Amino acid sequence: MKNACPRLVIAGTNSGVGKTSLAVGLARGLARRGLRVQTFKVGPDFLDPTYLTLASGRTCYNLDGWMTSRGYIEQLFARATADADIALVEGAMGMFDGASPQTLEGSTAEIALWLDAPVFLIVDAHGAARSLAATVQGFSQFEAGINVAGVIANRGGSERHHAWLSESLSAAATAPLVGMLPGGSLPTLPSRHLGLITADEAILPTAVLDQLADVCERHVDVLKIVELASRQRVAGGQWPVAGESQISDLKSEISDLKSQISNLKSQITSPQPLAPSPSSNPSKIRLGIARDAAFHFYYPDNLESLERAGAKLVPFSPISDTRLPADLDGLYFGGGYPEMYAARLADNVAMLDDVRRFADSGRAIYAECGGLMYLGRSLTALDGASHSLAGVLPIETTMLEKLRSLSYAEVELTENSLWGPRGATLRGHEFHYSELTNHLPIDSGWQEVYNVRRRFGDRNKSEGFQKGRILASYIHLHFASHPEAVEHFLSH
């Protein structure tokens, strides 16, 4: 059974080539003209999806082939695109970069292959002419089954440069040029850590989103891209040579475009969207979710899986709320940037006291990365200032100038825990600029219940700090990596 929604993948030859700007611009341009654009981001990154969510007006989902599975990704894609007109997937790093130096595992190419999606490859054209065709040909032929349908040249030059690149690609009988962005035409998006700064911090205005969309419409044949994305669902990958049409006004064509997409979707039988899982909890479990400027790194499908399993998610702000919501059964602190708001978090003594009381009550608390830092005794910022925090865990953290850890991680539970019995395995991602500056006291009652096997960096380590029904770790878990994990968590 094939999913009918037209789809496309925006990939790059490497990081920093303009994938996010192009993806956001295309998503915004299509959405503001009435198309329901469902966006996705390849890999574990929490940051770029915030921009894609703002651009499309719909929640962006991560597609990670290492943390989850092909079957899960196909089902998630089907569910998310059930009412969409088109799906846009932003890749990560270079198209073939992922969790392995030898295979497609965890790469953008793997997702394109699984979704049977045409790839539009972004290439840096600065200082390149016919050599760009060699690059594209290499990417097109490197792995079987990957369909590079079009090329978008970034940092291009004159009209003559455009013509030269187009002729070079045509002569090489490879994917056609569907756009060239002149150097400096895209607004610069500031960066922080891995990817972009958060949308909440940037308060990315509509004017900037529209500027990105305007640049894409001016220099990229958006209609050709949509046509190719739609045609793939019927033709099974036969790509016509694109012309060099320029978009001057999409408003008069958008109704026809939506009609074409609707007709194409009707030709293919779509799988039924995933039905909610029957809950084993007749009365809703009330799970408090820390959600504010300091805590916002959550995989949307993780939260949805909790809801399908019977949880009522109740948001609260550790920055501005003075008390936890009433009648909670558990707390979930995700990651984010607590170091940026450490003073405000420390000044909110009423909330810190309430979190400590909650921990003393024996109810469940789960914390990841920034949440781990918040539950600790103190956080020392880059300026040397130390901020007292919840003190639920007898740990202290310190911010570093350089990246401390960046890696996929497989977790084996060495003891029964909130996420499963001893011996269960889950997968996740670790990314942080802080480190623990003390060890757990031997007589504290805390255990390290994770045996962590990392893909990169230090290979193995013990982590996952647990005491009673409190569990905290630097690792962001993807719950789909262990299907029984959510039910086990809610039952505890």
Label every PLM stretch briefly.
Residues 1, 234-282:
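Intrinsic disorder/low-complexity segments
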Residues 2-115, 119, 123-150, 157-163:
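ATP-dependent carboxylate-amine ligase catalytic core
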Residues 112, 283, 295-314, 325, ...:
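C-terminal and late-domain segments of enzyme folds
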Residues 117, 175, 360-364:
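A short helix->loop->beta-strand "cap" motif at the edges of active sites that frequently abuts
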Residues 199-239, 281-282, 291-295, 462-492:
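Acyltransferase
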Residues 283-349, 353-360:
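Phosphate-binding active sites in nucleotide-utilizing proteins
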Residues 338-419:
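Cysteine-nucleophile active-site neighborhood
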